[in-house]
């Protein structure tokens, strides 16, 4: 215990925290082998729809996936610092944590030139960085023999950003068979939704046709689908042997 905390009537407890962790993760890797091409009709279960032919039309269907022979484990490095502070005889408790996570050599299926005979390759194709803030405040508002009232507030904010992808790869589709879909794109936040937007004038106003907005015909970034922040609070009280509590939560999404 620190000497200045022993008789301190305001700050009676304080703790600083710091941690470091590094974790490796291997993907599912299979040796490349010869795969006998087949014939199919229209489309098949692999993503995306490769050839939009009418149902029943047979066409050449090559094996669609190849594996990088130099595939390396994905590496995650995490740094975390924080503080726990208690005030006024621990009637007010404040906890704060900041974490930074760097993920390198992320393992993705990336698109490849169709001339190779494949659609995608499993390879190390990404680097991502995550910043996170967590704040928790708990206060004993009233304390008596037969009655007490407590309030708790929490706040969390997480920012994910794709730092880089494999050379020549602009974006990687991670979810969604057709648009809209989730993509990882270098230099952008993650996860972002991509889909068809609407035509707008120079002032940003929608261009309408028969009262309806017109499609731009081009895929564009529609915004981040994860909450900009999450927060909540709990309120609880006790009267003799009867206790009651309530919990509220809120997520704010800002595209």
Where are these regions (language model features)?
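Extracellular/periplasmic, surface-exposed regions of secreted and cell-surface proteins
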Residues: 1-185, 232-240
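Acidic/polar loop-and-plug regions of large Gram-negative outer-membrane beta-barrel proteins
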Residues: 54-58, 196-198, 204
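Short Pro/Gly-enriched beta-strand edge/turn motifs at strand-loop
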Residues: 214-218
């Amino acid at each position: 215990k620190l000497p200045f905390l022993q008789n301190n009537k305001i700050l009676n407890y304080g703790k600083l925290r710091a941690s470091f962790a590094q974790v490796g993760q291997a993907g599912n890797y299979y040796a490349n082998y010869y795969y006998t091409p087949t014939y199919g009709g229209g489309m098949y279960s692999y993503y995306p729809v490769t050839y939009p032919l009418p149902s029943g039309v047979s066409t050449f269907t090559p094996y669609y996936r190849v594996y990088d022979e130099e595939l390396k484990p994905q590496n995650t490095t995490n740094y975390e610092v924080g503080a726990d502070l208690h005030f006024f005889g621990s009637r007010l408790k404040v906890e704060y944590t900041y974490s930074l996570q760097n993920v390198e050599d992320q393992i993705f299926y990336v698109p490849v030139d169709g001339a190779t005979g494949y659609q995608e390759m499993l390879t190390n194709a990404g680097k991502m960085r995550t910043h996170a803030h967590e704040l928790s405040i708990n206060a004993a508002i009233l304390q008596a023999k037969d009655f007490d009232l407590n309030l708790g507030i929490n706040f969390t904010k997480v920012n994910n950003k794709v730092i880089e992808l494999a050379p020549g790869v602009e974006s990687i589709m991670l979810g969604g068979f057709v648009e809209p879909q989730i993509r990882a794109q270098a230099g952008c936040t993650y996860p972002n939704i991509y889909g068809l937007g609407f035509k707008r004038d120079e002032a940003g106003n929608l261009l309408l046709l028969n009262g309806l907005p017109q499609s731009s015909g081009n895929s564009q970034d529609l915004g981040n689908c994860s909450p900009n922040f999450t927060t909540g609070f709990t309120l609880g009280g006790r009267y003799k042997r009867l206790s009651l509590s309530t919990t509220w939560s809120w997520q704010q999404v800002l595209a």
